[in-house]
Amino acid sequence: MSLTVQTEQRGDMVVVSVAGELDMATAPQLQDQISDLLEKGRTRLVFDLAEVSFCDSTGLSVFVRAKNSTDDAGGTVRLAAPQRGVLRILEVSGLVEVLHTYPTVDEAVTASEPALD
């Protein structure tokens, strides 16, 4: 399955909407988009995961790298609206504690740090 990635500026945040399966084959596509955003100084990112049907460890590593990069630049990474299976992977891996996760994109965009579990 393919992956689609779209971005939208919302205030000082960039919403990165991801759809499809995020795995070893598709993670580089998302990583390239993130790298482009960071090069443009966009360091406040919300990943809309509502349409991500699957995420493996390669996909998780993309979010961890994004968090490390944005933290170094004084920014933030927030995850929004993960489907049950993706949320479960975040919980089992312990990343739900590290990657701020919100039930909706609107909550992720408007929330102050830290996030809800």
Residue ranges and their predicted role:
Residues 2-4, 12, 74, 98-99:
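A generic structural signal for alpha->beta connector loops
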Residues 84, 106-107:
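Acidic phosphotransfer microenvironment of two-component signaling modules
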Residues 10-11, 50, 106:
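Conserved catalytic submotifs in the C-terminal HATPase_c
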Residues 110-117:
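Intrinsically disordered or compositionally simple regulatory linkers and C-terminal tails
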Residues 100-104:
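Short acidic-hydrophobic, aromatic-tinged amphipathic segments that line or gate anion-handling sites
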Residues 3-32:
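STAS-typified acidic loop motif
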Residues 27, 105-106:
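Residues at or immediately preceding the N-termini of alpha-helices
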Residues 22-99:
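Amphipathic alpha-helical interaction surfaces in cytosolic regulatory modules
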